[in-house]
Amino acid sequence: RIDPERRQWLALSTPSFRDWFTAIMDWREQDRDSRHPIPPYSINDLPDTGLLTAEDLAGGTWLTVNVWAGSSETRVAATLQRNDGMQIDLQPERTQSGAGEAPRIGAEWADPFAAQRQLSVGRYALISREGEGRSQGFEQFKGSRRGPEPPRPQGAVADRNMHLWRARLPDDLAPGVYVAEVTSTDRHGAASTDRLLFELRAERPPRYFRTDVWYGTE
């Protein structure tokens, strides 16, 4: 359950996330009858966005803040604190000025927190042997059917946002565990604070179960 006092959520936009996002969105835009029936990736193919390397920083990694009721009068402040006590101030900027400009659309401007949940929806694949026919996949408004079929994007995806702030992480961060703390303040002075934990390592560990740790074999 979401805390009723909560007003925002945080995420990291990494190069891997943007590549993953772009590939699935490209598939989504293809003709339904001629495209491959299975999307190019699922959520299982997205590398952990809370585990970074220097390569991720060099390619551009942003801390993103979706302030749900954010406006041009909202103020957003952020800090990074490493596990040894070192602290860095970040300067989040709103991705849209809200001055009547065209929306910025695409991986660079997407909300990673929302998009990760929208681009690989598992309930499309729900299926059973003895259940009712209408319980396979899922139903939407007026009984429209979805699935059963491989997990895929839902209808609406957060590929643009009028209340998203972001701050690029420094390229020269040292390895360690970091906590990003973000406070947003609305025009009435009401503040909301959230934190996001991530780790910066020299290299990523293996993604899958390591039998060599247990049995001494690859």
Predicted features, each with a name:
Residues 1-218:
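Metal-dependent phosphoesterase/phosphodiesterase active-site architecture
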